[in-house]
């Protein structure tokens, strides 16, 4: 299902500002209205996420807390407790997104709804602007659930299992699969 959705978005993103916006929403795990496309500051940064839509810096960065023990020892030795990945975006995405500034907000909303309805025809669930940004993270969490379940069924101890490294590598793997298709 996710591969089907990503394929549609990737195929159309080169030529359609709306598809570029939806694709960027999925890739950056951010609702499209919260992307810096519609703001004066073209960079948004929070504790775990950074989105930049500047001409020389078009990327998003996501980080995950990897330590279950945020104690003094880790801080004292400055051990890396965060795993992160950065995905640069092609320049034409930025050019497409800048075209959206010429459009009215109501027009953008209606076009997004129109495109989501077209995508929904091939789905077994309702794709919305709210669940679209969670698409990749939900896939990763589902796969993580299967991995944990298989470890438990195999009788392995999962008390000290830390999924952090899994997230960053798996999401990149998933994106690579989408790009290749």
Predicted features and spans:
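Short, flexible loop/turn elements at secondary-structure junctions
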Residues: 26-29, 42, 57, 144, ...
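Basic, Lys/Arg- and aromatic-enriched nucleic-acid-binding interface segment
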Residues: 1-32, 133
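A short acidic (Asp/Glu
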Residues: 35-36, 140-141, 161-165
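The alpha-helix within a helix-turn-helix
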Residues: 25, 36-39, 150-151
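Active-site/catalytic core of tyrosine-dependent DNA strand-transfer enzymes
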Residues: 67-126, 135
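Catalytic-site neighborhood detector that most strongly recognizes the C-terminal catalytic loop/helix
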Residues: 153-181
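Short, basic (Lys/Arg/His-rich) helix/loop patches that form interaction surfaces
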Residues: 8-12, 104-152, 156-160
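Conserved tyrosine-mediated DNA breakage-rejoining catalytic core shared by Y-recombinases
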Residues: 1-8, 28, 37-82
